[in-house]
């Protein structure tokens, strides 16, 4: 019964949005932001459950990658909209980078930490041991993170970045697809969908994709614009609203799905979904921004980042480095999760250039310290580095 209520509730939010959208029932920016945001929120749940069911038909690692990709589709829609508008109005470039950097930092600082802390609170396990098959995610996250430092250095996002990052994403998906296939254990709404049989579950999945996809497509622009209008109305800095509130709405279903995995004791699936999402955001999402900008602008000119945007990118890259070092030994402890969360929270309130530089340097210093003083972390990081091939003979 609970699963039915979850499904009905999730279906109701995008369905209600269609009524609002086509009748113009919402009044004012707050009402429009609430209605469109709720549609994106509900669609995120539907897409996550559909992607969980996909594990019945494809390798587990690929299913987790697809789950992560689909689960962040709401944020992709909002961020790509900002990048598209930036091609017509350069002021929107700041919002595109704000949403992307905020989403990435929320994913690691809140999502990753919540996964481990839930396992500890519910099952009294002080650490998560990652399966070796998640080396795929860790290796590609290392590659994408290393490349991400080039973006603040050159101060632009260009079509060349799109080509490189899209190639990384495709390589990651292919690598995930070669992983061993395991039959998943489904619970809740995803288990209810799976009970419909092969034809039934695929039909329901297609219906979910159509409903949720349509809701996200029609709600992305109203949500983005109404959020900016709310900031102007209540004198809240628009950059911060877009950086934290927009990704919080679009990524909340993903966080909740990961926490539900953790509550069931499925630690590997919980953190695996979130690490896959981080890879997807650093590759496909970041790569999509200059492509959308170029198409809208009608030229191959790059998106030019100002000083604040470059600092935000650097801070986001530094956080990824620290997170990578933490999980490079395939073990994620309660203490490490608390540190990740504790380092993230001050960023919500300390927004000066000095604070951004300070946080970035602190992440990098802590990562270096762990590598220096932890033999297991040092071995894990060494395994992430490319090795020269030995010549035969």
Give each language-model segment a name:
Residues 1-393:
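Hydrophobic alpha-helical segments, chiefly the membrane-spanning helices
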């Amino acid at each position: 019964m609970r699963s039915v209520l979850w499904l009905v509730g999730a279906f109701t939010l995008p369905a209600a949005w269609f009524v609002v959208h086509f009748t113009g029932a919402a009044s004012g920016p707050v009402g429009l932001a609430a209605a469109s945001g709720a549609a994106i929120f509900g669609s995120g749940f539907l897409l996550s459950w559909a992607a969980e069911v996909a594990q019945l038909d494809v390798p587990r690692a690929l299913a987790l990658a697809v789950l992560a990709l689909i689960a962040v589709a709401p944020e992709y829609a909002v961020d790509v909209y900002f990048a598209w508008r930036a091609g017509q109005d350069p002021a929107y470039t700041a919002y595109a980078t704000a949403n992307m950097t905020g989403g990435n930092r929320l994913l690691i600082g809140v999502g990753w930490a919540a996964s481990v802390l839930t396992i500890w609170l519910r099952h009294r396990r002080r650490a998560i041991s990652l399966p070796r098959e998640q080396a795929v995610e860790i290796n590609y996250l290392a590659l994408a993170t290393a490349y991400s430092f080039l973006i603040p250095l050159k101060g632009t996002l260009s079509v060349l970045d799109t080509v490189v990052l899209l190639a990384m994403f495709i390589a990651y998906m292919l690598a995930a697809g070669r992983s061993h296939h395991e039959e998943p254990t489904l619970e809740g709404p995803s288990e209810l969908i799976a009970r419909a049989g092969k034809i039934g579950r695929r039909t329901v999945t297609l219906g979910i994709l159509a409903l949720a996809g349509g809701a996200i497509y029609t709600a992305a622009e109203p949500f983005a614009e109404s959020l900016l209008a709310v900031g102007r109305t209540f004198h809240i800095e628009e950059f911060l609203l877009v950086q934290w509130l927009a990704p919080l709405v679009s990524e909340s279903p993903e966080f909740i799905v990961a926490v539900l995995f953790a509550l069931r004791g499925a630690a590997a699936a919980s953190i695996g979904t979130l690490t896959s999402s981080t890879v997807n955001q650093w590759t496909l999402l970041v790569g999509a921004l200059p492509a959308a900008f170029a198409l809208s602008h009608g030229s191959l000119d790059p998106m030019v980042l100002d000083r604040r945007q470059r600092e935000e990118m650097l801070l986001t890259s530094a956080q990824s480095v620290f997170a990578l070092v933490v999980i490079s030994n395939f073990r994620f402890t309660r203490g490490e999760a608390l540190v990740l969360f504790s380092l993230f929270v001050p960023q919500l309130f300390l927004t000066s250039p000095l604070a951004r530089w300070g946080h970035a340097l602190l992440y990098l210093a802590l990562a270096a310290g762990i590598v220096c003083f932890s033999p297991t972390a040092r071995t894990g990081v060494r395994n992430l580095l490319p090795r020269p091939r030995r010549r035969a003979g």
